[in-house]
Structure formats: C-alpha cells, structure tokens
Amino acid sequence: MVMSDPIADLLTRIRNANVVRHEVVEVPSSNIKKAIANIMLTEGYIRDLEEYRDGSVDMLRITMKYGQNKERIITGLKRISKPGLRVYCRKDETPKVLNGLGVAVVSTSKGIVTDREARKLGVGGEVLCYIW
C-alpha cells in the first residue's frame, strides 16, 4: 500500500499509542520522520528513539513517555501542512503553540527545526505539525 502522507501516519500512530498508553511504537523510517521524532525526543515528549532494520525495511522504535500513574505527556498532535493544502510561514510569522507551551515543527532551508529555533535562525518554512 502506498502511503500518501507519511508524516500524518507517524503522528497518528503516536497519538493512538498515547491514547491506549502503549510503551513502544514502531513506524517505517524516513529522514523526515527521524527528524520529527528527534525533535520530540529533545523536547521531552518521548523517552527514547531507536533505528533498526526489519528485513529490508528501516524502522523507528519510539519509546513513549508518561508521567506518574501513566499520565500522558503528549496531550495533542496536529498535522498542519498537508499534501492537499501546504501551509507556509515567513520568518516573522512563525507560529507559537499554546503561547510557547507546545512546539511547532517547521521544515526550513536549515533543516527541520522547532518554532523557537526557526525564530532564532531567522527563517520561515513549511509548518509540518503542532505538538503539545
């Protein structure tokens, strides 16, 4: 089956695992998925990220992170720029998620970065998703 939106697939798998409080999520790997997962790791939304090979397919194993009593750390994930409707922002229009409590993932000419890093670098780009 050909996947039309691999980023939405990644976010949906993480969202579904978060709802039922799974410890581990496995998704097919790509450079953009790896970059988004790395941002989630550095921002503290997931516990661990591991890349491995399953036969001929590269996979990402994402270890979910929960608080005490299995409280969710990730309260929301939203895909913003979709294949049918791309959303871009200029360097002075970089969005803030929940007044800075969340993270916007932006694809820029300097790579895939958070909204704070994009503001610091002074670049705009395609707004991929919001995480809060």
Swiss-Prot record:
The keyword Aminoacyl-tRNA synthetase does not apply. InterPro entries: Ribosomal_uS8, Ribosomal_uS8_CS, Ribosomal_uS8_sf. One of its GO terms (molecular function) is rRNA binding. Keywords: Ribonucleoprotein, Ribosomal protein, RNA-binding, rRNA-binding. One of its GO terms (biological process) is translation. GO terms for cellular component: ribonucleoprotein complex; ribosome. PROSITE patterns: RIBOSOMAL_S8. Pfam families: Ribosomal_S8. Signal peptide: none annotated. Gene3D superfamilies: 3.30.1370.30, 3.30.1490.10. Part of the 30S ribosomal subunit. Contacts proteins S5 and S12. One of the primary rRNA binding proteins, it binds directly to 16S rRNA central domain where it helps coordinate assembly of the platform of the 30S subunit. HAMAP family: Ribosomal_uS8_B. Belongs to the universal ribosomal protein uS8 family. This is Small ribosomal subunit protein uS8. The lineage of its organism: Bacteria, Bacillati, Bacillota, Clostridia, Eubacteriales. The gene is rpsH.
